């Protein structure tokens, strides 16, 4: 019985870390940046769908519904939509696809439905798709949600994070953003969203798959860093935070701008 309990705890821990990209603060940052760049028309339509609540309010909804009535009534099928795995030497196209879907197929399906079949969707479906798009565009930019299949998106790569054992996946899900700055999500937004129009335009161009492959490239740098230490369980602390804070900031900012672009396109 004791052995079963230990195994169950391990499995639950894996499920938890594999879904919570950026943590709630990171998702709030992405949604808040996007909200600042919505067109007036998109704002009105979103405000109506969400009954006056903001997309920030629902940015982590897709994580929070696990083990809820929503989850038991079919949304457990979206469990694999939070990520896609790409092994070293592969691209998204050359990897065997998850039969349950992934972050790209989920986003593509919902965006197409919201753009081309909007009038035929029920209000409840529109609302749920909106909440999930807000969340998954954030996950699309979280490096370990584009990690290798061989180590389950960084879950199998153990590291010491300020002398505490964890996984590379967990570092990027929430620990990195909490260690980089002691800011609230609104302070993150105020300090990140200061770029020029040209940068925004360039970042907003592209497809979900192209954006995802950019995240894969960034994930590769993290794997290279960890492997270069030569340690069985690499020790990561202040130097790692210093070296990769710019990547953290860039991914959050880009996700916010791209989410705004997606929503403005849907609600044009």
Residue ranges and their predicted role:
Residues 1-25:
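Bacterial Sec-dependent N-terminal signal peptides
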Residues 2, 14, 138-141, 257:
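Residue-level micro-sites within transmembrane alpha helices that shape
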Residues 20-136, 143, 148-268:
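N-terminal, motif-rich segments that launch catalysis or mediate targeting to/interaction with membranes
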């Amino acid at each position: 019985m004791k052995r079963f309990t230990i195994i169950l705890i391990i499995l639950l821990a894996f499920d938890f870390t594999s879904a919570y990209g950026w943590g709630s603060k990171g998702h709030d940052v992405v949604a808040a940046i996007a909200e600042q760049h919505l067109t007036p028309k998109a704002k009105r339509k979103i405000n109506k769908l969400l009954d006056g609540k903001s997309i920030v309010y629902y940015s982590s909804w897709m994580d929070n519904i696990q083990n809820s009535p929503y989850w038991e009534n079919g949304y457990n099928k979206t469990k694999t939509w939070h990520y896609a795995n790409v092994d070293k030497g592969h691209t998204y196209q050359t990897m065997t696809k998850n039969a349950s879907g992934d972050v790209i197929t989920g986003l593509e399906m919902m965006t197409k439905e919201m753009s081309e079949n909007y009038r035929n969707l029920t209000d409840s479906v529109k609302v749920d798709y909106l909440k999930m798009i807000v969340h998954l565009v954030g996950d699309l930019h979280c490096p370990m949600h584009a990690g290798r299949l061989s180590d389950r998106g960084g879950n199998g790569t153990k590291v010491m994070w300020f002398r505490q054992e964890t996984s590379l996946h967990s570092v990027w899900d929430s620990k990195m953003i909490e260690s980089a700055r002691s800011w609230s999500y609104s302070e993150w937004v105020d300090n990140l969203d200061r770029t020029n129009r040209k940068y925004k335009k360039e970042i907003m161009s592209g497809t979900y798959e192209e954006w995802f492959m950019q995240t894969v490239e960034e994930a590769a740098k993290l794997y290279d860093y960890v492997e270069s230490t030569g340690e069985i369980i690499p020790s990561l602390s202040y130097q790692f935070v210093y070296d990769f804070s710019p990547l953290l900031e860039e991914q959050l900012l880009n996700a916010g701008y791209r989410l705004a672009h997606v929503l403005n396109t849907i609600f044009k």
